[in-house]
């Protein structure tokens, strides 16, 4: 028996959680079809579902057998959905890869999808290998997510995950030395940088 998660982050999370809990765990495979899932949620084994009380309230750490990513599927995404994945890509650049940050400022993600996806997956792989269960270094991957999850909840989940993470990152870096550069990069990709709630 095996499950296949063909879709975005929600599909991957739900499928991974079902695979982790059905018969105490069966094989599953991730086949991400969104940029966000390709660079982030399909990799690393975090699976969770939302409850009315908040995001990712019930879940498990459960690794897929493999992740298969075909960048051609990203061409079918509406601009808004594609933009959401850009927030997660930028997160990796902000986490300490100055060369990647410079690349994202100078180039366009859409024109360099394979290279960008491979770079983000490698960064996440390295972090997860060092801290699979989110006890230390992996917490860096939550950049923008604490505030972002609150924004999502306050909006009744009308604000997308990517937009909420962008708002969260902007809030966190606003007073940092390179905060203006980070906010400028988010804005380059059409991401919001101001929280609509006070």
Tell me what each language-model feature is.
Residues 16-107:
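A glycine/threonine-rich phosphate-anchoring loop and its flanking beta-alpha core
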Residues 1-25:
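Anion-binding (especially nucleotide phosphate/pyrophosphate-binding) glycine-rich loop
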Residues 2, 27, 35, 119, ...:
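Residue-level recognition of specific faces of alpha-helices
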Residues 9-14, 46-47, 61, 146, ...:
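Gly/Ser/Thr-rich beta-alpha loop segments that engage phosphate groups in nucleotides
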Residues 6-8, 32, 160-162:
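Active-site nucleophile and cofactor-binding loops and adjacent substrate-binding regions
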Residues 8, 31, 69, 143-144:
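Single, functionally critical "micro-switch" positions that shape active/binding sites
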Residues 103, 107-197:
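Active-site segments that bind and position negatively charged phosphate/pyrophosphate groups
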Residues 11, 96, 178:
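Short phosphate-engaging motifs
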